[in-house]
Amino acid sequence: MSTPQFTEGEIDFDAPGAGKPCKTWYKVFGDLSSKTHRPLLVVHGGPGVVHQYLLPISQLATDYGIPVIFYDQIGNGNSTHLPELKDDKSFWTEALFRAELDNLIVKLGIQDDFAVLGHSWGGILGARLAVDHTPGLKRLILADSLTSMELWSRSLRELRAGLPQELQDTLRKHEEDGTIHSTEYQAAVGAYFQLHVCRLNPMPEELISTFAEMGKDPTVCVAMYGPTQFEVTGPLKDYNIEAELDKIEVPTLLINGKYDESRSYVIQKFFRPDSGRELDEVCAVQPHAAPGRA
């Protein structure tokens, strides 16, 4: 696999309440100025993840000439970090990340014609763009995403209940004891990830580096989602876009995996006869990472 050419940079982002200037870091594979192909803007998951695990998608630039844009959301990766706001749940909102995304689209000059791939939490932001009829959004891909946190949480409970009893006991013990950072608990979470996050063995380096970056600064993840994978305690716990789905008019491709946390019923309400829907029989929540899938 050849490595496509890329450029990277930072743009200013005015984040009310941040208390300091903020920047959004981005990386573009291919040439945005050519205008021969519609650019694809890739929105990473989390909240609190970084772009690295999605990098296999950059091969689209080499194979098809499609410019592919990645970025790290505020609080993550190469963008401005705000650990001093870790307890301020009024700051860490969906609206903040939507404003950052709008700012990025305009500053990169793609606001008249672009496509979005939103993965997991990134799909929440992508769906919001579509519901709001964002000008210039021509195509949408929602990968491993959700229509409501209630359905997502139900899926997590069911998948956890399917783990070997020993792993379930380990998870429960450390959660009750407040020792979720212990090696034993993290190993149990890792076993769950191997089943329902990425089944490739070994895991791709891009995903390993993503987890490492998350560990350096969990501010966004803990503030918006919660301290563990299995219970949503942050502002996202009440997320539900189902009443607005009929506003989505842009052609949309839905992707989830056979072993995915985003099980079919989690995304089913997105589905309409004029949308595409694919069930990947080999992947968990990282379909882009499977060989030949970029």
Feature annotation, model-predicted:
Residues 289-294:
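Post-His helix in hydrolase/transferase enzymes
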Residues 235-288:
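Conserved loop-alpha-helix segment in the C-terminal half of the alpha/beta-hydrolase fold
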Residues 111-155:
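Conserved hydrolase catalytic core segment
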Residues 160-246, 250:
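Alpha/beta-hydrolase
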Residues 16-90, 104:
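Conserved HGGG/HGGXW glycine-rich cap/lid loop of the alpha/beta-hydrolase fold
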Residues 95-114:
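Conserved acidic catalytic loop of the alpha/beta-hydrolase fold
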Residues 1-23:
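N-terminal cap/lid segment of alpha/beta-hydrolase-fold proteins
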